[in-house]
A protein has these predicted regions:
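Sec-dependent N-terminal signal peptides
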Residues: 4-13
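Boundary at the C-terminal end of the N-terminal hydrophobic targeting segment
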Residues: 18-20
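Short, surface-exposed "cap/lid" segments of acyl-processing enzymes
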Residues: 22-57
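Alpha/beta-hydrolase active-site loop
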Residues: 50-52, 73-94
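Conserved alpha/beta-hydrolase
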Residues: 55-73
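Gly/Ala-rich beta-loop-alpha elbow adjacent to hydrolase catalytic centers
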Residues: 103-112
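The feature captures the conserved acid-bearing segment of alpha/beta-hydrolase catalytic domains
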Residues: 125-188
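C-terminal catalytic histidine-bearing segment of alpha/beta-hydrolase fold enzymes
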Residues: 177-211
Length: 211
């Protein structure tokens, strides 16, 4: 009886591990405003950050989402190390790097940028939204990202623009790179909303559609 029970438990454990290995994972890193103002904060121009709605959108597509509202004043590099450890743990259990995506919005997207540099995984996915400008590129010039990188920015946004310079200067292994320019007229506020205009491409990227 004990042997049968042990065999059953081992089978259940194997099924559980196999199930976890076949799931796709998204690390979602919200913007700085939410870190400072909290879930109920209302930006005077852009309104509320639709954090829960973004999480829900990824979950509805079958992703396991790993995310939290960070404490105000969180050290970005240390947080990137935390995300790296979590991603390493998933890979150690047998999850393919290509099934893991790190999505970062606004200036906090450079946490994702740092993770891309720390991981050195050419098959891991990264989505950088509204981050790149002369200042952020200069401040993070020593970070050499690898992986499949999707950059999304808004034409009317003065904070985040093209990340092409990052791709061109990186000595890391960038397997796939794509950039999308939106033109919503919402300036930096476009990334406060759970908009299909950026969520749609991000979801496709996280599913391995790099076209």
């Amino acid at each position: 009886m004990k042997q049968v029970l042990l065999s059953f438990l081992l089978l259940c454990s194997s099924i559980s591990i196999a199930s976890a290995q076949n799931k796709r994972y998204v690390f979602f890193l919200h913007n700085m405003y939410l870190e400072q103002a909290g879930l109920n904060g209302e930006h005077p121009e852009y309104g509320r950050v639709e954090y829960k709605e973004v999480i829900s959108a990824f979950e509805k597509e079958g992703f396991t989402v790993i995310s939290e509202v960070r404490k105000n004043g969180t050290d970005a590099v240390e947080y990137a190390k935390k995300v790296k450890r979590q991603a390493d743990s998933l890979i150690a259990t047998g999850v393919r790097a290509s099934y893991i995506t790190v999505v970062g919005t606004s200036k906090v997207a450079f946490i994702a940028w740092h993770v891309a540099g720390m991981m050195g995984k050419k098959n891991m996915n990264f989505v950088l939204i509204g981050i790149c400008n002369e200042s952020t590129i200069a401040d993070n010039k020593n970070v050499q990202p690898s992986g499949n990188i999707l950059s999304i920015y808004e034409k009317t946004d003065v904070i985040g623009q093209s990340c092409l310079a990052v791709k061109n200067s990186s000595t890391g292994e960038i397997n796939h790179f794509r950039e999308i320019e939106l033109n919503t007229g919402q300036k930096h506020g476009f990334l406060y909303k759970a908009s299909p205009l950026w969520l749609g491409p991000a979801i496709k990227w996280a599913k391995g559609n790099y076209e």
